[in-house]
């Protein structure tokens, strides 16, 4: 009972080393990744006028956001502009799989960073004396680096398609805008700067995790023999067993 209670010992030294310091950066970057993507809400507007009175424009709006199921984002108007039921018309595309994969993975990374930092700071000796924990940490780090590349690339492609689907191109694709009784002009679309930032942080995370892989590797048994040899060389030759 006493051993279990005294096992946790606060040691902030690992936070000053690359292993712990980079993990803090990974934790912060993960927060920015899922917050900038998962918290986005925007809208795109088109201006509609009814012929022959084309001087009077009315606004029709489609609101969209995470997880970016644009095919469920219907257009809304104060009334049936030009006799059209705009609610039955939606944007094009479903990009929820890429967006949710990216955000969900970022949340898991966020949680793992907390667990890893707790291990580094509270159980420093347990981590460094164990052969399994550093190896597990190293494998997770390598896998996370790869998944950051995959998830961010998929999300970047989806973001490009989202920008196209909410751009002036929608005027050409909306069926009511093709009718002779209506005239449509693109109005505006919410800036997607925060989504661009999410992509940047995704690739930044990949770089951080890829770089940190080396420092995690140095804690594993794959690298420890070289450290052991170095320490033996400084302290003198170790006699063979039995002598």
Residue positions per predicted region:
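Short, motif-level signal for alpha-helix interfacial/capping segments enriched in acidic residues
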Residues: 83, 138, 182-184
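Helix-loop boundary elements of multi-pass alpha-helical membrane proteins
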Residues: 1-27, 115-144, 214-233, 239-242
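Juxtamembrane loop segments immediately following a transmembrane helix
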Residues: 51-67, 152-195, 225-239
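N-terminal helical submodule of small eukaryotic multi-pass membrane proteins
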Residues: 2-124
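C-terminal TM-helix exit segments that contain a strictly Trp-centered aromatic cap at the helix terminus
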Residues: 36, 147-161, 212-215
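Membrane-lumen (extracellular) interface motif
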Residues: 39-45, 123-132, 157-163, 192-195
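Amphipathic alpha-helical interaction segments
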Residues: 72-76, 120, 156, 163, ...
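Physicochemical signature of membrane-embedded alpha-helices that form the seven-helix bundle of GPCRs
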Residues: 15-28, 94-115, 133-150, 191-211
